Amino acid sequence: MTQTKGIVSAVNGNMVSVTFEGVVSLNEVGYVHVGNARLKAEIIRVRGREAQLQVFEITRGVSVGDRVEFTGDLLSVELGPGLLGQVYDGLQNPLPLLAEKVGYFLERGVYLPALSRTSEWMFTPHVSVGERVVRGDVLGYTPEGALKHRIMVPFHMGDSYEVVFIQTAGTYRVHDVIARVRDAQGHEHELTMAFRWPVKRPVHCYAERLKPTEPLVTSIRTIDTFFPVAKGGTYCIPGPFGAGKTVLQHSTSRNADVDVVVIAACGERAGEVVETLREFPDLTDPRTGRSLMERTVIVCNTSSMPVASREASVYTGVTLAEYYRQMGLDVLLLADSTSRWAQALREMSGRLEEIPGEEAFPAYLESCIAAFYERAGVVRLRSGEKGSVTIGGTVSPAGGNFEEPVTQATLKVVGAFHGLSRERSDARRYPAVHPLDSWSKYPSVLDARAVAYGRSFLRRGAEVEQMMRVVGEEGTSMEDFLVYLKGSFLDSVYLQQNSFDTVDSAVPVARQKHCYAIVMRVLGSVLAFESKDDARAYFSKLGHMFIDYNCCAWNSEAFVEKEKEIRAFLQGESTKIDSEAEGIIRGME
């Protein structure tokens, strides 16, 4: 700790004004003394000899004249082996250990180390004495679950160093010295398996930043096919309350084709975090065959926890994600919900008496949101390997109003927009991603022409539906009515997905391509019916057959039989296919 001390001069909610003597810096951590407790706080503004601190605890009992001590360190997290499978709060306190120490009701001023000081890790050296290393270079390895965890030179060491000592292979604790390095001035530095890094400072220990192009497979048809996300990309899921944002994120976290998932639950209901904690240990990661919890880190600040630490939780989550990216891994960060984070910013901005922007959010809201999403990306490390951080954030606009500031600021910086619709969720069309309002800048797992052909039916079908509401079904031509039925068919059998069915909840890319080719045959078929009732009955029967087909295990006997039945049904009504659709299908097959 530094020798800088201060005393409380004013208290306003969870913001404390402190008069100090000495040197302090923005985002530095300080502790406010209240009786026997020390409340953690962060400097958010410095003016002359007075600083404003946001306290990460309830400030009940804090009074003018209380002592404040400053640490000289920025708000930071501990990085090292043992992060996977943990549940932290926004300040990286392990919540299960906190519960053991103080019970289920959190006490103020209790902080525990993020990484276990007693656990031992099998260390295998990667460098030899005499080699030169820089920050981010690998010193050795230790197994962490199914991953090969890299022990790296701390990111804050900006010089080039010579290795003068490296431990032999064996078991060590996280704070045992595993290497010593010498800088250009001849000073030696001891290195351990763990180090600290400020949460609001992006990690730049890489050779090159690349453009995200490789699709991130989520196993959700509507996302992978129509509104894809790339590894290292960004996307947002805005939607009204109860539209299915959290369920969609949970499905993504279970099935996404990534190595590590970081869930930052900032300001959401505690029940949703509890659901994750109950489900994930029992679920199997299809890539490794191990428990899903072994690849997951949860950073949760629920709505019942102090508001200030919500802001810290998203930064804590993205810093942990960047750490695993430096190991050449693909990481997915899910922030639920960024609206609560923005509300925490608004609350603190109001207490600082700053000039408010739209809806009382701070004027710098857009730059804060942009700086957060810019920490996503694909990078090429110095070793030549690639790592990525993909950020997906939910937005909870009041009343589902997408024109509010948080949604608009997010739309300017993300690469994909998965807008959830109240109309679709009320109709139980899940996932309730609106097929016309949503968009993506990333390449799909399917052929672009096939996707465009399907979207044309969704768009034209919606136009016909609007027309039918005015003139009725009788005033609609058979040609338009068939376009409407084909659009509804595509929606019901491909866009909608049953997240509670063991088969339909996760659809591999090979199956998506195979099934979409059959859907294309339906969309491109030239059909003739005597009446609209016959057309409706035909598509109703075909839709039910396809929904049963979706629930058959991929390449199983039931799957093959159901596909034969569907193809025979299609052949019975029409063998002629539109030339454009036929060309696309031939290219897909």
UniProtKB/Swiss-Prot annotation:
Which Pfam families does its entry note? ATP-synt_ab, ATP-synt_ab_N, ATP-synt_ab_Xtn, ATP-synt_VA_C
Q: Does the keyword ATP-binding apply?
A: yes
The EC number(s) this enzyme carries = 7.1.2.2
Residues annotated as signal peptide = none
Stored InterPro entries: ATP-synt_VA_C, ATP-synth_a_Xtn, ATPase_a/bsu_AS, ATPase_F1/V1/A1_a/bsu_N, ATPase_F1/V1/A1_a/bsu_nucl-bd, ATPase_F1/V1_b/a_C, P-loop_NTPase, V-ATPase_asu
Identify the PROSITE patterns for this entry. Answer: ATPASE_ALPHA_BETA
| Keywords assigned | ATP synthesis, ATP-binding, Hydrogen ion transport, Ion transport, Nucleotide-binding, Translocase, Transport
From what superkingdom does this record's organism come?
Bacteria
NCBIfam families for the chain: PRK04192.1 (NF003220)
Name recorded for this polypeptide? V-type ATP synthase alpha chain 1
